[in-house]
Structure formats: C-alpha cells, structure tokens
C-alpha cells in the first residue's frame, strides 16, 4: 500500500485534510491572549481550503483474531487481547487502576508472579488502548518457547483470581494516590499542559480540567474495579498473536486449554 503512494496522492491528502476547520491550536505558558490571537490570525487567518471538514461516522468493532508469524529468533513474543473500553467510557479510570495493579509495572501481579517468583519470562505486562469507538486490553509476554505453556497457565490463573474477588480497598486507595500524583506531576510541565489541552479539545470537544480527572479517579471503588475487570476479561472474546520461535507450541490449543 505505502509503495503505491506518490506525490499527487500525498498532495491531495494534504489539501483534503489540512485546513482551518481541522486544526486545534493549543498555547500554554507566559503569553498575552489578545497578542497571541493577533499573531495567529496574522499567520493563519488567510489559510483557506475549499474542502469542508468531514466527520466520519464509521464504527470500528472488535474482531476476534489469531495471528502467528515465525521469525528467526530464540524467543517467542505473545499478546493476548480482549475488547477494551472507549476513550470516554465512564469506567475507563477503573480499568486504568486495574491495569496498574494487574500488569502495569514491576509491582504488578503479572510481573511479580510470573517473572519474579517463577522466572519464566523476559518481560510481561499489560496495557490499555482506547479510541473514540472501541478499545483493547492487552497482555504481552516474551519468553523461551519451552516456557510458553506454563506462562499461559499462570496468566489464566491470575485472570481467574482477579475476576473472582475484589482487590483490597487499601490497595485501591494506594494505586489511586499513585495515579493522581503522576497526573499532577505531569501537569507541572508547560509542554504537557499544552499537549493535553490540545488533545482534549481535539478528541473530546472540550478541555478536561485537572480537578475533573482527579475527582473521577478518587470516585473509583474496589467494586468498580472488579466489575470492570469482569466485563473486559471475557475469555470467549480473547484474541492472540505470537511472533518469533513458534516451534513446539500450538497456540490455538493453548488458548483453548487455559482460557476457554
């Protein structure tokens, strides 16, 4: 596809998408508003395009997928994926807290149980991806191919445990404090404030205030985290990808054995 792009294609794409109706300008720091608006109008006020802004109404739906790709390396890299939450889903902060506890760092359950206690993986973690109309929750691990079955077994055990019983409220509280602290520290950077404000306006239609984010994080309970984990970690909708040394492993069979 990319090889087929030529100068005319790129130029047409630019003309179609890059114009005033499609731009968000975000400014942060030491400036005078009227002076800044004057300068922006001077530089960009005459920038006209005939093509109107087009809001695409297509909806991206999660599709169960299984992908395997052999590569000439010693390790195997595996991702297990579940339908996640959209960017504006009311439980997105509950999922963020769950992800932090489950696989979001070196103190998470996945890292401690599978890498530290059992020494089975080179790396293991989870993360969330959110878009306007869909999302994905992903677990990633890299390991010696001989350890794959045991790693799948332990991941399955962890999934069962975290969807069977809520995390202690004290642990939830500590995680929320950590998330809020990281968020506040991030807002101390002028560059971060500028980027966050612009992205919020572009993607949400308004600038999300710091106090709003903090309040929504603080409002999450252990019951919210458990309910969200149960909703997201639907093993009937699990997808997987495996890349690397695939010899000796039937990944479809392993997924069926431990997650179905």
Regions found by a protein language model. Give the residues of each.
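Charge-rich, well-structured scaffold segments of protease-associated domains
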Residues: 1-52, 68, 85-86, 94, ...
């Amino acid at each position: 596809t990319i090889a087929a792009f030529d100068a005319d294609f790129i130029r047409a794409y630019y003309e179609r998408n890059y114009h005033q109706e499609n731009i968000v300008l975000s400014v942060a720091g030491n400036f005078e508003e009227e002076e800044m608006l004057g300068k922006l109008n001077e530089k960009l006020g005459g920038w006209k395009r005939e093509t109107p802004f087009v809001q695409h109404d297509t909806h991206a739906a999660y599709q169960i997928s299984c992908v395997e790709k052999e590569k000439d390396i010693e390790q195997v890299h595996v991702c297990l994926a579940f339908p996640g939450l959209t960017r504006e889903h009311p439980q997105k902060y509950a999922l963020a807290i769950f992800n932090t506890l489950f696989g979001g760092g070196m103190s998470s359950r996945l890292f401690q149980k599978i890498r530290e206690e059992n020494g089975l993986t080179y790396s293991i973690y989870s993360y969330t991806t959110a878009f306007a109309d869909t999302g994905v929750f992903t677990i990633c691990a890299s390991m010696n191919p001989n350890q794959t079955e045991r790693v799948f077994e332990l991941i399955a055990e962890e999934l069962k445990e975290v969807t069977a019983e809520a995390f202690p409220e004290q642990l939830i509280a500590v995680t929320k404090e950590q998330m809020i602290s990281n968020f506040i520290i991030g807002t101390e950077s002028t560059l971060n404030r500028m980027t966050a404000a612009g992205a919020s306006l572009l993607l949400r239609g308004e600038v999300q205030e710091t106090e709003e984010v903090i309040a929504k994080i603080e409002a999450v309970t252990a019951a919210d985290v458990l309910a969200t984990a149960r909703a997201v970690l639907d093993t009937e909708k699990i997808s997987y990808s495996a890349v690397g040394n695939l010899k000796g492993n039937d990944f479809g069979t392993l997924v069926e054995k431990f997650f179905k």
